[in-house]
């Protein structure tokens, strides 16, 4: 379900009366002969360069001053499950597909549908098997209000951006470290004779964890009464980036 903020955003996008880098307007749902266009649009939106959710807003007539074309009884209308099945049946590289859903929004002059393409870090999303003119191995994206043509691939700078996004290289250091902490097996011990234990992230060794026991604090406090361990231990843990500590 669309949040109130999303609904306000959709209304604002419609009021702009132009398409953009993460939203597109369609007068009606894609008919059978235009299913390749649907897939192509979804891939382009999933690889958008804004690093955010994207929208295909269906039921807005661009040629009629962006008026609402009511979708209540529209032909070829799809539910979320139908759209998910459509995407699932296409062969994507690595089996990694865009996440999509269909939301309905009631406006004063009629009903519109919104295909929401969720933001994800598995970019670039690429077909490994062509589908009716949508080419395998082509990387499609969207720049301003234009999709990459089906017979072409994105520019190298755009492809580089999408791979950087996948590897979390677009994140600030403090955002990156929380992602790295999920990968316990990628942290290595630092040999040290001191009482402080150190580990570094092997693919970005500027990130270091330091922790040491606080023997003088060992013991129960009121919020540990439900714990089974009869001898709780306390540690000071620091996350270090190079030498400064962004968070203790």
For the regions a language model picked out, list residue spans one by one.
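Bergerat-fold GHKL/Histidine-kinase-like ATPase
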Residues: 1-67, 75-81, 150-243, 247
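Intrinsically disordered, low-complexity boundary segments flanking structured domains
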Residues: 6-15, 85-90, 101-103, 128
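Short C-terminal domain-edge/linker segments immediately following a structured domain
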Residues: 54-57, 87-92, 145-150
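A broadly used, surface-exposed interaction patch
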Residues: 62-103
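Surface-exposed flexible segments
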Residues: 66-77, 127-139, 240
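Intrinsically disordered, low-complexity regulatory tails
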Residues: 94-179
